[in-house]
């Protein structure tokens, strides 16, 4: 089963500052629907941004990328000699009553990854088992900024035929570290729950205001506004394992 790490950072203020510095955030989903109508409200309020990928490292994101706790715990979890961090990205969510789909993360192969290969093709390569010899084992850590209404993570450490475990409540400044490429996991419903799931267009943006709140703006319309600690904020870290 994955490891739950607590009190990952001495202070979460440095992460809050990073989130502000690297705003705005845009809706998840462009990779599978690049020709989507930019005026159709088809996306949940699930916003994302890359802080580290193959050609880019956002200033300050090294606190995640080179996190000693993640690296040492990954070595122990996998009994590995080398942990090579390569990706950090942010998910910010609100008003998603149904949560997300149960899934495993996309695999990474020698020469093939999400930077140069469509996600659907990576999934086909994974589930065909024809490319197992070329797959690079991945360690994943998911860190949460705060406790919010709902927003738990369900995961299936014993396989999808067994009941899931849920990490919910007391999530602030914790991280779940393990194999999200082999273990099914799912974001639970995310509140607030008064108005159901609110959809936005692919052009929507989430960004901070001068009043210390965060606002979703969609074609100049203010869709939702709340303090940052009312949003479900998670930061994902991934590393090659050798």
Where are the regions that the model predicts?
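Short, conserved beta-strand element in jelly-roll/cupin
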Residues: 112-114, 119-149, 177
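Catalytic core of Fe(II)/2-oxoglutarate
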Residues: 137, 148-242
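A structural signal for short, well-ordered beta-strand segments
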Residues: 88-90, 141-143, 235-239
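Charged, glycine/proline-rich intrinsically disordered loops and linkers
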Residues: 32-42, 103-105, 109-127, 194-224
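Non-heme Fe(II)/2-oxoglutarate
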Residues: 1-80, 89-93, 97-100
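Active-site rim elements
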Residues: 57-62, 127-130, 162-164
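Short, surface-exposed, charged loop/turn segments at secondary-structure junctions
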Residues: 51-53, 104-110, 156-161
